[in-house]
Design a protein with these regions (language model features):
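N-terminal secretory signal peptides that target proteins for export/translocation
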Residues: 1-6
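Bacterial N-terminal signal peptides
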Residues: 8-21
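Sequence/structural signature of beta-propeller domains
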Residues: 26-398
Length: 398
């Protein structure tokens, strides 16, 4: 407690005197101001995203909170060689003293400064083994009796646990959240708290948090001012036309989203289960507590989108989406910009309408992120062994 108080006093004094903060001297800056030295009380490590200065954001679905963690990982680097780990689930299990069915890789995120790869992992602490639902993203399966672990993948492919004991961090509690004992009402049987946070992204001074709330429009996109501050949360309840379900929906959460621009204006490109793709203009979102998005594609029912990234090739921008029950999909940004709204149901199951996509080989892709302009890092399930592999795939494959 004494050390924490001293650090907070020095940070405050530096601010008053207009001096660089201690964190700036060690490589940090304004984004670390107001953080506390200690051990973040993360109950369940879920989705992750990186912000400026190498700050890691980690969603805590069970605790209904988001943590900002300074990993002190700010040395610029470029990865030019593939980093492949065959059987990464077995190696993680051995490292954490359990078996492969006793862990879940909830998310994968790349620090864009250092290009180090980080994994959000759950280790089961109660009965051994998770109950995987084959067509559902693993992040939905975080159990209440699992311990969060943060893993770093080195440039040489080694796995290192990142101790979250003495780190600089800050915490933002989410409003209108479900409690861990909230009733189960999903078709797939997951508790509502497991959907409190489904995806994160940092956008121009705000952390966007997709998921559910206990509001009338349960599907919610929260926007947290960062550095976190009291009263720094804005929320918008979202409605989207679900072509396969033949209705407008307000309870289905965004599964994955991408900050994007259409004709120079910022939007959120959001993908939902079963699988509508919708656009939400950010300027409109900031002015409304509830809003209806524009559905621009139906990518096929019985499927769950997992991750979405953007990349450029030959001067053109594309979107890459990984899925549970479909191949990976490549969509042209130009087609998204030209897309018309879809307001009528599909005529048959599994039909696709709206924006077209190119199917990309990559069955079993569970986690996906852009490593740099050369590589995409993917964790996929091996269809022969059933195990998990992590591979870095050249960008020109897509």
């Amino acid at each position: 407690m004494k050390l924490r108080a001293i650090i907070q006093f020095l940070l405050s004094l530096a601010t008053i005197l207009g001096l660089p903060s201690m964190m700036s001297a060690s490589g940090g800056g304004a984004m670390t101001a107001g953080m506390t030295l200690g051990a973040p009380d993360i109950k369940s490590g879920g989705p992750m995203a990186f912000g400026p200065e190498g700050i890691l954001f980690m969603g805590d679905t069970q605790g209904a909170a988001v943590f900002a963690i300074d990993l002190n990982d700010r040395v610029s680097n470029t990865v030019s060689k593939p980093i492949d780990i065959i059987g990464i689930d077995k190696k993680l299990a051995a490292m954490l003293g359990t078996t492969p069915d006793g862990i879940l890789i909830n998310d994968l995120a790349v620090n864009p400064i250092s290009q180090n790869i980080y994994l959000s992992v759950s280790r089961r602490t109660g009965r051994l083994g998770f109950d995987p639902i084959p067509i559902y993203p693993v992040s939905r399966l975080i159990a209440a009796d699992s311990a969060p672990v943060l893993i770093k993948v080195t440039k040489k492919g080694a796995l290192e646990e990142v101790p979250l004991i003495k780190v600089m961090f800050s915490k933002a509690m989410l409003s209108n959240q479900f409690k861990p004992d909230a009733k189960i009402e999903s078709l797939w049987g997951e508790a509502q708290w497991q959907l409190t946070i489904t995806h994160l992204a940092y956008v121009d001074g705000q952390l966007f948090v997709a998921g559910l709330s206990n509001e009338e429009f349960s599907s919610t996109l929260r926007r947290l001012t960062f550095p976190f501050k009291q009263g720094g949360e804005e929320t918008t309840g979202l409605e989207v036309f679900h072509t396969a379900h033949e209705r407008y929906e307000t309870r289905a959460p965004i599964d994955t989203f991408l900050p994007f621009h259409i004709k120079g204006k910022p939007v959120v490109l959001a993908a939902y289960g079963c699988t509508p793709l919708a656009v939400f203009p950010l300027d409109e979102m900031k002015q409304k507590k509830q809003m209806r998005g524009k559905t621009i594609a139906e990518l096929g029912s019985g499927n769950q989108p997992i991750d979405m990234i953007s990349f450029k090739r030959d001067g053109k921008e594309y979107i890459l989406i990984s899925n549970t029950n479909r191949s990976m999909m490549r969509i042209s940004a130009e087609d998204i910009e030209r897309a018309e709204p879809i307001t009528t149901p599909v005529k048959e199951s599994n039909q696709t309408v709206g924006v077209k996509y190119a199917p990309i080989a990559g069955a079993g892709a569970l986690q996906l992120d852009k490593l740099n302009d050369q590589f995409v890092v993917i964790i996929n399930r091996d269809l022969q062994t059933g195990g998990l592999n992590m591979r870095t795939t050249p960008m020109d494959h897509f």
